Amino acid sequence: MAKLALINREEKRRKLVEKFAAKRAALVAQVKDTKLSEEERMAARLALQQLPRNANPTRGRNRCSLTGRPRGVFRKFGLCRNKLREIAFRGEVPGMTKASW
């Protein structure tokens, strides 16, 4: 089980990403717009740099919803491989069967 502080930190990052998503997208569009003058684009770059670092979606980490484990997480289920295996063997995941060939 991951420390509760790490799980809370990820949740805080997720909220910051949501909060600044629209502003961030607008600034990125201004930076990429070649029709604007260099001064306007530079001002947009500086404004983008002033946003909180954790407002960047790439800083987020997928974690298991049961254990908080950061590695081996299946996006479709939101579970780490260990817990997904346990749940699948109990038959709680519809349509999932053990592979045989």
From Swiss-Prot:
GO terms for biological process: translation. Pfam families: Ribosomal_S14 (PF00253). Gene3D superfamilies: 1.10.287.1480. Keywords: Ribonucleoprotein, Ribosomal protein, RNA-binding, rRNA-binding. One of its GO terms (molecular function) is rRNA binding. Coiled coil: none annotated. InterPro entries: Ribosomal_uS14, Ribosomal_uS14_bac/plastid, Ribosomal_uS14_CS. GO terms for cellular component: cytoplasm; small ribosomal subunit. It comes from the Bacteria. Belongs to the universal ribosomal protein uS14 family. HAMAP family: Ribosomal_uS14_1 (MF_00537). Part of the 30S ribosomal subunit. Contacts proteins S3 and S10. Binds 16S rRNA, required for the assembly of 30S particles and may also be responsible for determining the conformation of the 16S rRNA at the A site. This is Small ribosomal subunit protein uS14.
